[in-house]
Amino acid sequence: MPKIFRSLYVQVLIAIALGILTGFLFPSLGESLKPLGDGFIKLIKMIIAPIIFATVVSGIAHMRDTKKVGRVGGKALLYFELVTTFALVIGLVIVNILGPGRGMNIDPASLDTSGISKYTDAAGEQTVADFILHIIPDTLISAFTQGDLLQVLLVAVLFGFALLRLGKVGDTILKGIDTVNQVIFVILGFVMRLAPIGAFGAMAFTIGKYGVGSLAQLGYLMITFYATCALFIFGVLGLIARMSGFSILKLIRYIKEELLLVLGTSSSESALPRLMVKLEHAGAEKSVVGLVVPSGYSFNLDGTSIYLTMAAMFIAQATNTELSLGQQLGLLGVLLLTSKGAAGVTGSGFITLAATLSAVGDVPVAGLALILGIDRFMSEARALTNFIGNAVAALVIAKSERAVDVDRLTRALNGEDLPTIEPDVHSEERGEGRELDSLRPA
């Protein structure tokens, strides 16, 4: 096999192209390939919880300083709040300027709401108090069996601080956790060999089921949303990256394989483990990456934030529901809270949108039926923006903590070959370190 075809980047790219072609030419066949994409996502989700647990525990325990843990966590949460708020505002401003829903003149009573009932029902079942209580698992084990990232994060943080209190006994347990983490990443290497198959099945299903022609009516909203995400990535995140001393374009090139995987599966979770490896490989300390990236998947969903404000205002415009400035600010205020739980709710952004519209009451919930058909096509932009946003966040926090090898980061982003990840200062005696090549298909 030619060397170029051994690259995961090329394999996934070819798989996406073949998936689009299959779904377009053979729609029925494309729909039937859905299990390929679902199976790959399930394999990834199978190992996400243990990876996050081991990485967060290791990150906290290796810091040794509880004040540093609190400082990094505080910086991350402040960054997440500021950037996601900016994303919400940008979405609100652009949808008001361009008005993709104006002129549709749709009567909410005429919409078929049968397809959105499962989302509105799920949204109605969860209050703010329920969401907070949901973070606490019924048992330590249930957090892992249910695969809830927020619950796993809570257990991991408590476990990490507990190890700090145990002293030498904690160090012994930590060595075992680090070993388990290495085993999990070997398993990840096996799973990633199936990435092209998963991307092929997911893309074939999407095109086969929904078709390209069915997007024409709501295409303006999609174009507006994709353009807004691009503006946010290259404008806002690009400026943040530049202020922190690195290029957003070089970062995107560096994580291009992971971005293609996200594009093919429409899931930013599918590349989460590889993102952490790549950031460590680029010189960011494992302890910071292990805290910032997993928490970012619950609290730093920039693409989802843009989607929520744009979708809500699109429904209002399409149904001729006039919202005053005060009502729009009220909507924004509710979204500041509900958007932070998007990854912790089954159904993600769409249920969060339903919950928000139900809570605000100014925008007809029935209008969700308008965007149900294209939500799947908008998920790619959401996932890509979320993914890039978390990559930027990790590097920004790491640089603010001086927890990154600047020279190594520069070389990595410039495309230089750095095959072996340097071990952090706390793990040199154990010979830790993962080889990036171990995650590439042979």
Swiss-Prot record:
Q: Which InterPro entries match?
A: C4_dicarb_transport (IPR023954), Na-dicarboxylate_symporter (IPR001991), Na-dicarboxylate_symporter_CS (IPR018107), Na:dicarbo_symporter_sf (IPR036458)
Statement: the UniProt record of this protein carries the keyword Lipid biosynthesis? no
Region ranges (Disordered): 418-442
Its main subcellular localisation, reduced to a broad class, is membrane
Locate the transmembrane regions by residue number: 10-30, 40-60, 77-97, 144-164, 183-203, 221-241, 331-351, 354-374
Q: Name one Pfam family in it.
A: SDF
* UniProt KW keywords: Cell membrane, Membrane, Symport, Transmembrane, Transmembrane helix, Transport
Key word Transmembrane helix present in the record?
yes
What function does this protein fulfil? Responsible for the transport of dicarboxylates such as succinate, fumarate, and malate across the membrane.
Q: Which family does it belong to?
A: Belongs to the dicarboxylate/amino acid:cation symporter (DAACS) (TC 2.A.23) family.
What name has this protein been given in UniProt?
Answer: C4-dicarboxylate transport protein
The protein's organism comes out as Deinococcus deserti (strain DSM 17065 / CIP 109153 / LMG 22923 / VCD115)
